[in-house]
UniProtKB/Swiss-Prot annotation:
Residues with PTM 3'-nitrotyrosine: 60
Protein's recorded name: Eosinophil cationic protein
SMART domains attached to this UniProt entry: RNAse_Pc (SM00092)
Top-level taxonomic group: Eukaryota
Annotated organism of origin: Pongo pygmaeus
Chain's role: Cytotoxin and helminthotoxin with low-efficiency ribonuclease activity. Possesses a wide variety of biological activities. Exhibits antibacterial activity.
Residues binding substrate: 65-69
One matching Pfam family: RnaseA
UniProt EC number: 3.1.27.-
């Protein structure tokens, strides 16, 4: 019985890892905490146009990311959303650490227009701006994160 249970647990962990529950197949670069990577990918008061803004993300991941959303607000404002009531994450219903913003913020959506680009310096994006609410997943900070915020955003789940 024990070997079967142990094998089942390993299979479950592998399945969770591949399905993205434990993280994305396009994981964050190792030098960043989840909160730091969230900030790089999703928080910018005045992001440049998408093609320029996405270069930083694509250089770290060594690929053209299909799409990305920048919240035009401060990291501190997103941290404050982590204090809103917990909700089930709309895009991953197994997670219950999401929080919805109380206010709409300006967003910049970036969509890759040339998915066949062989070189990351050739990634091109279409820009779309709008104002929306957003939902973020939050976790306790990593020891490498600033002690200023005990709970930090780690994932942009959706915009509403």
């Amino acid at each position: 019985m024990v070997p079967k249970l142990f094998t089942s647990q390993i299979c479950l962990l592998l399945l969770l890892g591949l399905s993205g529950v434990g993280g994305s197949l396009h994981a964050k670069p190792r030098q960043f905490t989840r909160a730091q990577w969230f900030a790089i990918q999703h928080v910018s008061l005045n992001p440049p146009q998408c093609t320029t803004a996405m270069r930083v993300i694509n250089n770290y991941q060594r690929r053209c990311k299909d799409q990305n959303t920048f919240l035009r607000t401060t990291f501190a404002n997103v941290v404050n959303v982590c204090g809103n009531p917990n909700i089930t994450c709309p895009r991953n219903r197994t997670l219950h650490n999401c929080h919805r913003s109380r206010f709409q913020v300006p967003l910049l959506h970036c969509n890759l227009t040339n998915p066949g680009a062989q070189n990351i310096s050739n990634c091109k994006y279409a820009d779309r701006t709008e104002r929306r609410f957003y939902v973020v997943a939050c976790d306790n900070r990593d020891p490498r994160d600033s002690p200023r915020y005990p709970v930090v955003p780690v994932h942009l789940d959706t915009t509403i």
